[in-house]
Amino acid sequence: MASNIRIIFYGTGGSWPTPLRAMPGVGVKIDDVLNLFDCGEGTQKQIMKSSTSFMDIDNIFITHFHGDHFLGLLGLVQSMSFNNRTKQLNIFGPHGAIKILSNALNVGYYTLHFPLKIYELEPDRTYDLGKFLIRTMLNDHPVPALSYSIEERDLVRIDPEKAREKNIPSRIIEKIRENGSYVYKGNEYRIDDIAGGVRKGRRIVYTGDTRPMDRMIEFARNADVLIHDTTTDSSFEPMVNEFGHSSSRQAARIARQARVGRLYLYHYSPRITDTSVLLEDARKEFQETYESKDLMEYEVKVRRDVD
């Protein structure tokens, strides 16, 4: 059975909060597993306004340690503790995560009532998180920063005719799918016995802050969704590139070359009030470009292509 995958844009601004936008924070919910990518100031309040609960967060992935991407963590963790959370929270980040986050989370007087684990991730690695994989890449930014690719496992499509020929009931088919094989009435059935092709898993790429990079084209290749740093429109490219960011036009070029399904503009400069200029710039390069907005949600549809 294919997973339900939903993206929730909690906050879409950058640098500092404005009346229009909250700080960076993106939820990716895969069935009942809620992942948070970046946690800027005020993220917990944005989550309260959304269809999700901050108590349900399983994993937090920080792209880098500029304040607008992680200063919301302390309040979020304390609120979880005040609300009697018991399940483990995993926080992932680039080099320096353990020292920086341990210091930040030890500020003030409060008691942590649940297990919290901090992990430092290496670039150019793939990590198995059970229902999905996380792939990392080093960004072009003034401090250590990672892009994340959230990858659903490939799904074997069951050929109902093959299953019918072998008299395998549907409840046993699911056990075969889950385990790769299953013994039923004394016979072992393998997934290959009833397979009708493989449906490629869906992929979401979240860049965090970065200058435009050729490596991003390959990293995001054929992703269903690319959420890319688009701090300004093309008229400010030299300035934003100098500070380690991208324009909407540059992000759209990457999206087009990577052949992604859709691009979401993200991490708008607080000086920008009208993002339609960024969208117009981007769509000259890549038509399937969309503005992200605070509290907007998008369901990532199951791929129809089967190998």
Curated annotation (Swiss-Prot):
The protein's UniProt keywords, in alphabetical order, are: Endonuclease, Hydrolase, Metal-binding, Nuclease, tRNA processing, Zinc
Keyword presence, Aminoacyl-tRNA synthetase: no
InterPro entries the UniProt entry points to? Metallo-B-lactamas (IPR001279), RibonucZ/Hydroxyglut_hydro (IPR036866), RNase_Z/BN (IPR013471)
Q: What is the required cofactor set for this protein?
A: Zn(2+)
| A Pfam entry, by short name | Lactamase_B_2
Where Zn(2+) 1 binds, per the record, is at: 64, 66, 141, 209
User: Which Enzyme Commission number(s) are listed?
Assistant: 3.1.26.11
Location of the active site: 68 (proton acceptor)
| Highest taxon in the source lineage | Archaea
Entry note: cofactor: Binds 2 Zn(2+) ions.
Q: Which GO terms describe its molecular function?
A: 3'-tRNA processing endoribonuclease activity; zinc ion binding
Binding residue positions for Zn(2+) 2: 68-69, 209, 267
Q: Please state which protein family the record places this protein in.
A: Belongs to the RNase Z family.
| Subunit structure as annotated in this protein's UniProt entry | Homodimer.
Role this protein plays: Zinc phosphodiesterase, which displays some tRNA 3'-processing endonuclease activity. Probably involved in tRNA maturation, by removing a 3'-trailer from precursor tRNA.
Stated name of the protein: Ribonuclease Z
